[in-house]
Amino acid sequence: MSEPSSSKVKADSLLPPAKSTTAATAARSANGSTNTGASQLTKHGIELPSQEDAERLGFNVFSHILDPRLLRALADLGYGIPTPIQQKAIPLALAGKDILARARTGSGKTLAYGLPLLQKVLDAKSAVAKSDANHQLTRALVLVPTRELAEQVFRHLSVVIEYVRDDIRLVNVAREASEKVQRLLLSEKPDVVIATPSKALNYLQNASLDLKSGMESLAIDEADLILSYGHDADVKSLLGANFLPSHFQSFLMSATMTSDVSKLKGLLLRNPVVLKLNHDDEAASGSNLVQFYTKTTEEDKFLLAYVILKLKLIRGKAILFVNELERGYRLKLFLEKFGLRACVLNAELPINSRYSIVEEFNKGKFDYIVATDEPTGASGNMQDDEGDDEEEDADEREADEVDEQAEDQREAGKKRKSSEHAGAETKSNKSKVSQHRKGKNGASEYGVSRGVDFINVSCVINFDLPTSVDSYIHRVGRTARGGASGTALSFVVPSDQVGRSKYLYCASTTRDESVFKMLNKPSTISLLGSALQEWKYDSSSVAGFHYRVTDTLKSITKALIREARIKELKNEILTSSKLQSHFEDHPDDLAFLQHDKALLTSRAQQSHLKHVPQYLVPKIINPGAKLTKSSGSEYKGYVPKNKIKDGANDRKNKGGKRRSSTGKNTTGAAGKSRKKVDPLRKFSNK
């Protein structure tokens, strides 16, 4: 879909656009391929499928290098055409190359490294007799920055191995389970282990996890966040100590190229193939993200959120990102006052509850999530990514020009030196690592904007502008995933408006203009694929809602927010314990979980706010259209103070006569008696 030619965009344009190798591998390759299109030959002499073949054959274009059982599972899951990153990464990975891939979120990076990783496990086990002790070894480790992403990767790979479950076992040690249970699972030497760096290091140090005996592949997903999420000490200890074999294949998958990725590249990769998904590839995959911004005040943020959601200027599901936990609950309570159901996704909730919220949202049980994306580590610092592309091009040229054997020797020397240096530092780092885990482990392993796969999200609203370009890229990556279309809208507070409203003040707004300037740099626009367009709305058309919004915001006090947080946290802790035990045996009971239930008491709720009087509806809405309440009943313009009793013939409302057991006519309980009785007349003072 082409972008609007004018920078002035009408309010209704916020509607999202329409959706548009090993011996075994060599043996399969000898059987021939059905490809007939013009395949691409890389400078490494590896054949890549053409776009025409990929569109015609789907994942069967890899039939000569992937196990038929994996292809069958992909077909059952409805996977059609492999994405550009998958078309390039899978053949190169199965040829034994280290991969450094940069592609936007939602481009299919998980399968891009997951399929080669699983295929290598199948090939290795087929070459060893089952009676051999080396048949069952842990051959692959997948490191991710957050527990949510670990669970997501585990579930994605679990369905892909549907027809090879007898040959491949997966374990996710990032889950909240007792260490005794996890150690028991690891003692069986699962083929693939998925973990956060801190969890992996913990089990390596207590000898529960053995990677040195047989690990062949190491994949780091969301590599740009691994170090910035407070895992830097854990990663350095994991790579520097004597836990890993001397040779293994590495995959670094990232949405952005940062200094953290460069550090990991130097530590892990040997003569890597650098893959960068360009905008032509994104267009070929059908990605269509339209980005808007508007400059507004803190109070008007709530006004615009109300107008956009209540008047349904966007259709479908939406994620609203805030930078502070308290603001997340303030926004939820604010929307709740107007009858808009939403839930808050934040680091305070147990991991099972957080993942359950994502699952319910993906299933369509509610349409709006308020996600706290608090700046942590390097992500909280403003980063100027200008020059990243030049660094990548230089790195790629260097990787191509250097002779592979000389590079291997040099990297081996580096690893020996780093191993010796790390050995000397291990003792001094141990105390720091343990202190870091005690204080920050829970928060560092939470991240809703990074990697978590939200399904069919129509719009991302940056209620609070992120504090870095990288964070912005990850946030807007929650929509327009997998070839779908989506919209991103960002609220920017001008510097002269910062701090005007003390009770709505957000510290990160002091950086809004600086971050906004970085988002408009040519290098960032090139990375995003398009520039942000200004959304200019008619302020007079929404002025009538100001009094509603202002009064409602004043009613949401800090005490009310604190009570709501405590109430929800207690409920979610109970829910989480049930999820761990009871709901594993009774999955149908999950339907009774409601993570978006009201936090306000019935007295605090004002039912008239759930309706929009017809005289307030702006002209941008079709005058003939009828707005609907959250319950789905028909909208009525006039809302009286007292409830109107409908149905004149209804016995319950009318209070009609009924015959008692004695045969006398009595008045219905809901109706009024014909003769008023004064109780004081019958009162006798005896």
Swiss-Prot record:
Its EC number(s): 3.6.4.13
GO biological process: rRNA processing
Primary enzyme class: hydrolase
GO cellular component terms given for this protein: nucleolus
Basic residues bias locations: 429-440
Predominant subcellular localization, coarse grouping: nucleus
Domain Helicase C-terminal intervals: 288-543
Motif DEAD box boundaries: 221-224
Sequence positions that bind ATP: 103-110
Sequence segments annotated as region (Disordered): 1-41, 373-444, 631-686
Database matches in Pfam families: DEAD, Helicase_C
Basic and acidic residues composition-biased segments: 419-428, 643-653, 676-686
Record's catalysed reaction(s): ATP + H2O = ADP + phosphate + H(+)
Domain Helicase ATP-binding: 90-275
Record flagged with keyword Disulfide bond: no
PANTHER family: ATP-DEPENDENT RNA HELICASE RHLE-RELATED, DEAD-BOX HELICASE 56
Family: Belongs to the DEAD box helicase family. DDX56/DBP9 subfamily.
Name the record gives this protein: ATP-dependent RNA helicase DBP9
Lineage: Eukaryota, Fungi, Dikarya, Basidiomycota, Ustilaginomycotina
